[in-house]
Structures are given as C-alpha cells and as structure tokens.
C-alpha cells in the first residue's frame, strides 16, 4: 500500500517545481528500497539528523491559516507536509518523532503507522508555500508568500543582529548607529595622547592620561599630568616646602614663595642651629687611631667628621660657615626685593585686565538695543538651595536699551517655601543702573518692559511665560540712580510658580533663560500693537 502511494506521488510530481520533484523522487526511492525489509530495519537506517529537524512554520498568516493546513502535533503550519494511509497530514519531523517516541500508530486515530508508509503531500506543500505571511521582525510591515520569507529575512532591515563588539542584539537599521555612537566597546581616541581604547575604558584613561591637562591644587596652574610632579617639587610657588635648615632642627613649613622671607627673618636662629649641630657632632666623634684613618680630605665637614681637627680648625670652620650665611643673606635680600617688584607689576597687570574686562562688558551691554537674554546656569543648584530654605537672589549683568539708552539689570528671587502669600514663586524685577548716557536722557524712565521666561522645548510652537508692565515715573525705581545700581526695583513678586516651571521645558541643560525687552517712550507702541496688555505689577526693594 505504501509503495502504491509513493509511485502515485512520483508520477504526479513531474509538473511541479524541481525541488518538489526531487523530494518526491527521493521519498519514493526510499520507500522502494525499504519495501523488502522490516519496519524495524527501516527505522535504523534513517539518519539521526531527522530527529533534529524543526517543527512547523511559526509565522503569522494573512489571512489566518486554515485548520486543514495545521499539524495536529505542533499546531503550526505544515512544514514538509506528509500524509498517512489514514488520510491525516503532519509535519515530516513531527510524525517521525511521534512514531519513534510514542509507537507505531497515528496520533489522531491510533491506526497502525510505520515510517515507510508516509508519503510527501506535495499539493499541501505547494498550497502552504503560496500563503501570505507577515514578516515576524518587530517594526517590519512587509508581507510576502511563505516561500519568500527566508530570502526577505536575510535582507530585512528590522532583523536582529548581534553587535560585533558588545554582542547585544539590535535591528539592522539601528546597528550602525549603535556601533558608531552608542556601543560601550566602540573604539575612541584620547584627545590628549591619541591612544585608542574602548569607550567604556575612556573615563579611567582620562583620570591617568599623562598628557591630559590638570590643575595644580596649590597655584591653579594648568599643566599636563606628567609635568606635575616636577612642578610640585621645583616650581610651584604656593606648594608647601620644608625649611632649607630642616636637617639642623628647623621644623617650619611654608609656601615656596615665602621661603626666602623665612630664611631672611630667621638667619640668626638658623646659624645657632648649625653651630649646635656641628658642636654636637664634634663631641660625638671619638679620636681615631692613626693607622685606621681614611685618606685626608681638606673640606671643613670631612675634617670635623674625621675626629682629628684641632680647636683652631673648628673655629675656622665656623667662621667660614658664618661668612657663607652672610653672603646667602645678601642674596636673599636681593631676591626678596626683586620678588616684591614683580608682585607690584603683576598686581598692576591684574588691575589693567579687570579694567579691560569691565570695558568689554560695557561695550557688549550697549549692543543689546533693548533686548537682553539672561542665561542662568546651575539653576538646579539654586532650586536645591530654595528647597533647603536658603535665600536665593541673583542679579543679571547690566544692559542698555539702546545707544544711547538707559542701563538696566534684572533681579531674580526664589521665594522660600515659608514665605507668606508668595511661597515657592519666582519673583522678577528690573532695576535702573548708572550708565554712560544718563546725563543725556530724560528722567524718570518711561516705557514698557516685557519679561519672559523662555520655553526651551523643541516643539514648533513654544509656550513662553511672559508679562508686560508699564513704567510708573512717580516711583523711585525709575528715577535716575545715584549709586551704581538703584536699590529699588519694579516687577512681579509672583511672576511664576515653581510648579509651573517644572511642567514644561523651561530648564534645559541646567540653564534657565530669562528675556527682557524694553521699549522707551519713543517706541513703546510696538508692544501694544502685538495685542499684549500689561497686568498689575509689584514694586520691590
């Protein structure tokens, strides 16, 4: 019966694809060869790799798979479909494993079933391979016939591949970005020494790189790391050093630039220490017999240590040392005078630099033309101080409304949680300042001021928080200042609540942006034309 089915299968496979024909012919040949032997012998001749074949197709069909194409054993689409004499269809690997494990019977109706009674169902195979399936890779929307699924998966951009460096799985479309920018094992180079390393090792390397710039902990000089030991030992003016006479008993430590002054102020005490040390040395050394003496050395210290110098030689040695100390004292005085001259020169240079910096800041302030954006960095630190009920008051640099124009600045105050009626609010005020053009401007100041906390999100439409206020000439806040900054300010005690500050991206990279736009009485109509109406303000001190 089995042979008859195989011959029919072989005969019908001539019109199918070469693959189906080859499989049918192979199956028929195996059946014909096994026809003359028992079922047990047939089972023993099959390769053990048969048992390792996978089960049915575990993919999503569109439309869903019909039940007639499901394997009763694995409940998936038939793979290499075979049919039994009793008319049931199974995956080839599933039914062979069932026969070998559970016995020679059909799993559906328990009819006697041998392996050599199975024959390929090429019709079912062709029908199943023609069904439409969805790509199983997450994110891929492609659909194809089942026979093309394997080729598609080999090129699918959403297929998972292991990173060759860290072995983590990623989709093909994301793998290049991961390898180039995200992988902890990607190769990077040190900007200082050009050594290549894995990114995850870069932090440790940066802490030990011999060519990295480091700051001296004593004088704040910037040097490369490999130069720092010599800098500490020889050059650093503020590094702590012991006194030159420490071996003679002076235990003072001081900054290197104070050493000369210390030697100058303590010359006499250092001489006493040396004399006491030399006297103790001469008393401690016993006379040495002539036959045990070392070769003669004419240096003062060698004569003392040899134990053979006379009292006269000892006095001469002390006189020589005192003369050397006097010469060193003169040298120290000269070096001290030079150092004081250099210190005065450096102080003058610092004053000049500060003056130039002030002039540059003044010129930059004049370029604002009434629009100034104040960048407040480390804002998280200010918020933490506010939560700890520490006062937070920050003033912006000065800026001009034009050239010529009024000079103003902003003041931001984070109200404490315990403040009455304004707890946890941002207070924002404007102060007038003494400027270069005050004598040419009309006083008191008159105009309109728009204060804005900028939304730093990437949204196309940003929701800034802003208020507009009109100057009130009768208030002291708008009179001509008599000191560098008018202590009276004008603005809002309750400009914005801190809870509202956290609802959108007002803080980005730990920075808050506050914008101030000022229109004097000559151009204040521009703000009103935009449709903004000022609300009542609170003057502050």
UniProtKB/Swiss-Prot annotation:
Covalent link (Glycyl lysine isopeptide (Lys-Gly) (interchain with G-Cter in ubiquitin)) residue numbers: 125, 338
InterPro entries given in the database record: MATH/TRAF_dom, TNF_rcpt-assoc_TRAF_met, TRAF-like, TRAF1-6_MATH_dom, TRAF6_MATH, TRAF6_RING-HC, TRAF6_Z2, Znf_RING
Entry superkingdom: Eukaryota
Entry's localization field: Cytoplasm; Cytoplasm, Cell cortex; Nucleus; Lipid droplet
Region (Interaction with TANK): 374-541
Glycyl lysine isopeptide (Lys-Gly) (interchain with G-Cter in SUMO) crosslink location in chain: 125, 143, 472
Key words, A-Z: Coiled coil, Cytoplasm, DNA damage, Immunity, Isopeptide bond, Lipid droplet, Metal-binding, Nucleus, Osteopetrosis, Repeat, Transferase, Ubl conjugation, Ubl conjugation pathway, Zinc, Zinc-finger
Gene3D superfamilies, A to Z: Apoptosis, Tumor Necrosis Factor Receptor Associated Protein 2, Chain A, Zinc/RING finger domain, C3HC4 (zinc finger)
The keyword Acetylation is assigned to this record: no
First and last residues of each zinc finger (TRAF-type): 151-203, 204-260
Subunit note: Homotrimer. Homooligomer. N-terminal region is dimeric while C-terminal region is trimeric; maybe providing a mode of oligomerization. Upon IL1B treatment, forms a complex with PELI1, IRAK1, IRAK4 and MYD88; this complex recruits MAP3K7/TAK1, TAB1 and TAB2 to mediate NF-kappa-B activation. Direct binding of SMAD6 to PELI1 prevents the complex formation and hence negatively regulates IL1R-TLR signaling and eventually NF-kappa-B-mediated gene expression. Binds to TNFRSF5/CD40 and TNFRSF11A/RANK.
Family of this protein: Belongs to the TNF receptor-associated factor family. A subfamily.
UniProt function note: E3 ubiquitin ligase that, together with UBE2N and UBE2V1, mediates the synthesis of 'Lys-63'-linked-polyubiquitin chains conjugated to proteins, such as ECSIT, IKBKG, IRAK1, AKT1 and AKT2. Also mediates ubiquitination of free/unanchored polyubiquitin chain that leads to MAP3K7 activation. Leads to the activation of NF-kappa-B and JUN. Seems to also play a role in dendritic cells (DCs) maturation and/or activation. Represses c-Myb-mediated transactivation, in B-lymphocytes.
Protein name: TNF receptor-associated factor 6
């Amino acid at each position: 019966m089995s042979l008859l089915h195989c011959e029919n299968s072989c005969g019908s496979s001539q019109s199918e694809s070469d693959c189906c024909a080859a499989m049918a012919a192979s199956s028929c040949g195996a059946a014909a060869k096994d026809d003359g032997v028992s079922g047990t012998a047939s089972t023993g001749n099959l390769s053990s790799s048969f048992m390792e074949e996978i089960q049915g197709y575990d993919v999503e069909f569109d439309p869903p798979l019909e039940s007639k194409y499901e394997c009763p054993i694995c409940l998936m689409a038939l793979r290499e479909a075979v049919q039994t004499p009793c008319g049931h269809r199974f995956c080839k690997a599933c039914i062979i494993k069932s026969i070998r494990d559970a016995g020679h019977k059909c799993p559906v109706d328990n009819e006697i079933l041998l392996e050599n009674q199975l024959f390929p169902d090429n019709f079912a195979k062709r029908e199943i391979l023609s069904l439409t399936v969805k790509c199983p890779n997450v994110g891929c929307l492609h659909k194809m016939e089942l026979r093309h699924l394997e080729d598609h998966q080999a090129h699918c951009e959403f297929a998972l591949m292991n990173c060759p460096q860290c072995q983590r799985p990623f989709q093909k479309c994301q793998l290049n970005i991961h390898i180039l920018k995200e992988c902890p094992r990607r190769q990077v180079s040190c900007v200082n020494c050009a050594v290549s390393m894995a990114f995850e090792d870069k932090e440790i390397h940066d802490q030990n790189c011999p060519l990295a710039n480091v700051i001296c902990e004593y004088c704040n000089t910037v040097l490369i790391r490999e130069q720092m030991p010599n800098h500490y030992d020889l050059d650093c003016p503020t590094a702590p050093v012991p006194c030159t006479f420490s071996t003679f008993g002076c235990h003072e430590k001081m900054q290197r630039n104070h050493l000369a002054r210390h030697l100058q102020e303590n010359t006499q005490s250092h001489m006493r220490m040396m004399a006491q040390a030399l006297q103790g040395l001469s008393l401690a050394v016993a006379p040495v017999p002539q036959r045990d003496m070392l070769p003669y050395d004419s240096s003062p210290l060698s004569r003392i240590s040899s134990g053979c110098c006379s009292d006269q030689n000892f006095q001469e040695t002390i006189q020589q040392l005192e003369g050397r100390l006097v010469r060193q004292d003169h040298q120290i005085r000269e070096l001290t005078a030079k150092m004081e001259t250099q210190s005065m020169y450096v102080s003058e240079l610092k004053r000049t630099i500060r003056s130039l910096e002030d002039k540059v800041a003044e010129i930059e302030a004049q370029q604002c033309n009434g629009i100034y954006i104040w960048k407040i960095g480390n804002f998280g630190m200010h918020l933490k101080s506010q939560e700890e009920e520490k006062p937070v008051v920050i003033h912006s640099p000065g800026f001009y409304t034009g050239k010529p124009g009024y000079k103003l600045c902003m003041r931001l105050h984070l109200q404490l949680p315990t403040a009455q009626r304004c707890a946890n609010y941002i207070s924002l005020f404007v102060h007038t300042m003494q400027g270069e053009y005050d004598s040419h401007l009309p006083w008191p100041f008159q105009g309109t001021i728009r204060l804005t906390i900028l939304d730093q999100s990437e949204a196309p439409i940003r929701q800034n928080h802003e208020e507009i206020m009109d100057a009130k000439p009768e208030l002291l806040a708008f009179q001509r200042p008599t000191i560098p900054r008018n202590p009276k300010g004008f603005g809002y005690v309750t400009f914005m609540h801190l809870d509202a500050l956290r609802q959108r991206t007002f803080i980005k990279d730990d920075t808050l942006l506050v914008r101030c736009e000022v229109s004097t009485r000559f151009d204040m109509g521009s703000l009103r034309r935009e449709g903004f109406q000022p609300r009542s303000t609170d003057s502050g001190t």
